[in-house]
A protein has these predicted regions:
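OB-fold ssDNA-binding interfaces and closely related basic DNA-contact patches used
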Residues: 1-96
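Acidic, gly/ser/pro-rich intrinsically disordered tails
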Residues: 1-5, 10, 157-182
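Beta-strand elements of well-folded, non-transmembrane domains
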Residues: 38-40, 133-135, 155
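A beta-strand/beta-hairpin structural motif
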Residues: 99-116
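Short, flexible loop/turn elements at secondary-structure junctions
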Residues: 101-103, 133-135, 150-152
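Exposed beta-sheet edge/beta-hairpin loop segments within beta-rich domains
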Residues: 111-127, 134-144
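OB-fold/S1-family single-stranded nucleic acid-binding modules
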Residues: 139-158
Length: 182
């Protein structure tokens, strides 16, 4: 029997929202989410993901899509080289998946100790994820979604996204004196 649950190999986390749920559009339910960047050379993880997607599609055929596979089925596994590499170099050589959950995921370190500090797991660090694939049919959109179960942080790396300078570095070099012209 095929399973829709996958424990990934080592992946890079991007767009990390796992400590506080967030609604991405007005009127949507707040969810915990993360984008997983999966190295294309991790053939074992890719194989497990493709098998889980196939299992979710088979489930959808019988439970959501009226006995047949829709022609324009939305697929969760996307190619970073084809879709994002021009705007985000960290997507080069990667597949990516967007995962979310209404429930907060379990978050642990490599020794399985719970991580409570939101600064400890960030966009750019590496880890593993427990995810599940499911069919959906919402407002005419049909496809396979990805649920987020748990996160395990394994290693630090450079932060991704808009790194902000500290206030000290922004203002520390100026010799600013009180000016009565204000």
């Amino acid at each position: 029997m095929s399973t829709t649950k996958v424990i990934t190999g080592k992946v890079r986390f991007s767009y990390v929202n796992i400590f506080k749920s967030r609604a991405f559009q007005a009127g949507q339910d707040a969810k915990y989410s993360v984008c997983l960047l999966i190295p294309k050379e991790d053939k074992a993880t890719i194989k497990k993901i493709k098998a889980a997607i196939d299992a979710a599609v088979q489930d959808g055929i019988s439970s959501k899509w009226g006995g047949k596979k829709p022609a324009n089925l939305k697929q969760p596994l996307r190619d970073g080289d084809a879709e994002r590499a021009d705007e985000a170099p960290e997507y080069e050589g990667m597949y990516f998946l967007n995962c979310n959950s209404i429930q907060k995921p379990g978050i642990v370190d490599k020794d399985l100790n719970e991580i409570l500090d939101p600064d400890e797991v960030y966009s750019g660090c590496w880890g593993r994820a427990s995810i599940n694939f499911f069919p959906f049919n919402t407002n005419g959109n049909k496809g396979v979604g990805v649920g987020l179960n748990n996160i395990q942080k394994l290693k630090d790396d450079d932060r991704l996204g808009a790194a902000r300078a500290s206030a000290e570095s922004d203002f520390g070099g100026d010799d600013f004196e009180d000016d009565e012209d204000f």
